[in-house]
Amino acid sequence: MGKCRGLRTARKLRNHRREQKWHDKQYKKAHLGTALKANPFGSASHAKGIVLEKVGVEAKQPNSAIRKCVRVQLIKNGKKITAFVPNDGCLNFXEENDEVLVAGFGRKXHAVGDIPGVRFKVVEMANVSLLALYKGXKERPKS
């Protein structure tokens, strides 16, 4: 059938375009507001939380590894998330009930690489940058 092409078809074209927009995945996600509700951070880039436990997440095939992660309960809304702890041996800096700063992990609302279901990474532990702890530039404060 094709689209209307004649004179006085602007209203029909405009209405059709308005309806068809909702079949576009990105448009729907941006305009319904449900993606924002589902995001544990809300509209923020980082969030603070309390470490509940240390967990090992098995990497997806064909890799064989246990990725070191922590379960974190966010302070602002009480939601529980799993966050990846980057760098070698950095899991040793963390203990349960520590306060951590968590950021996104690259792809918006998607898991990264071979770590299934993990969408966040730890940036700070006990108000000290994880990178500074790893490089030995700073030490973990005594609690």
UniProtKB/Swiss-Prot annotation:
GO terms for biological process: cytoplasmic translation. Its main location: cytoplasm. It is found in: Cytoplasm, Cytosol; Cytoplasm; Rough endoplasmic reticulum. Pfam families: Ribosom_S12_S23 (PF00164). The keyword DNA-binding does not apply. It comes from the Eukaryota. GO terms for molecular function: structural constituent of ribosome. GO terms for cellular component: cytosolic small ribosomal subunit; rough endoplasmic reticulum. Keywords: Cytoplasm, Endoplasmic reticulum, Ribonucleoprotein, Ribosomal protein. Belongs to the universal ribosomal protein uS12 family. Component of the 40S small ribosomal subunit. This is Small ribosomal subunit protein uS12. It comes from Gillichthys mirabilis (Long-jawed mudsucker).
